[in-house]
């Protein structure tokens, strides 16, 4: 459920004038995306932050947070603010599922929109997560945008964009070889300040920006 596949849905919400939140799932409903009442797309990073904020700060639940390598650093910041232990794992929900089965986990989720929460099954469930967010909206009496602002008040605003590129196998191999050799030290005018290579490569351009 990514934005480029949901243009018609976003437009329906935007023109309706009486929809507070839109919920989008993939075919087997294990992934989630949301839209606010103005038809603005809410990505998985914001949803993860909302769930952590609601379950811990509002409901008073505790537990470890697990997230994938490609998730926003804002999760690290929110967990630090709330005193929650954070595990960052390789990409793929199987790495989170193992933690959720063996440990006390509040929220486990990754950038692709697969999220699991405490009190439910240790597996992705997009519909359930949507219901939890709707519960948050109903009990608080606030809009989705207002709830996101609550999170921003703690960790600051941020933006995320994902672009999936179709490239030739030869170019892919060349890029991987360059990454392995450490050949990328800047992207355009942005200098790389550090590199994480837990699963692929994450090039940090500042403490809060990465490629």
Language-model features: where?
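Well-ordered alpha-helical segments embedded in enzymatic catalytic cores
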Residues: 5-12, 47, 51, 95
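Phosphate-binding and adjacent anionic-ligand microenvironments
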Residues: 21, 58-211
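Short glycine/threonine-rich catalytic loop with a Thr-x-Gly-x-Asp
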Residues: 26-27, 41-46, 121-125
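Short, acidic/small-residue loops that bind anionic groups at enzyme active sites
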Residues: 41-62, 90-92
């Amino acid at each position: 459920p990514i934005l480029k596949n949901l243009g018609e849905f976003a437009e329906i919400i935007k023109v309706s004038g009486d929809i507070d939140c839109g919920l989008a799932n993939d075919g087997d409903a294990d992934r989630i995306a949301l839209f606010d009442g103005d038809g603005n797309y809410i990505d998985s990073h914001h949803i993860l932050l909302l769930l952590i904020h609601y379950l811990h700060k509002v409901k008073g639940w505790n537990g470890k947070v697990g997230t994938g390598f490609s998730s926003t650093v804002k999760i690290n910041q929110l967990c630090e603010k709330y005193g929650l232990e954070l595990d960052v794992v390789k990409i793929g929900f199987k790495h989170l599922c193992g933690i959720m089965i063996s440990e006390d986990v509040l929220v486990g989720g990754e950038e692709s929109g697969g999220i699991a929460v405490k009190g439910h099954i240790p597996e992705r469930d997009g519909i359930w997560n949507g219901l939890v967010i709707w519960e948050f909206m109903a009990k608080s009496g606030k809009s989705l945008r207002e709830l996101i602002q609550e999170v921003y008040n703690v960790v600051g605003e941020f933006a995320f964009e994902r672009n999936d590129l179709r490239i030739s196998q030869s170019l892919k191999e060349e890029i991987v070889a360059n990454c392995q050799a450490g050949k990328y030290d800047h992207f355009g005018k942005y200098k790389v300040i550090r590199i994480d290579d837990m699963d692929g490569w994450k090039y940090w351009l500042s403490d809060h920006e990465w490629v």
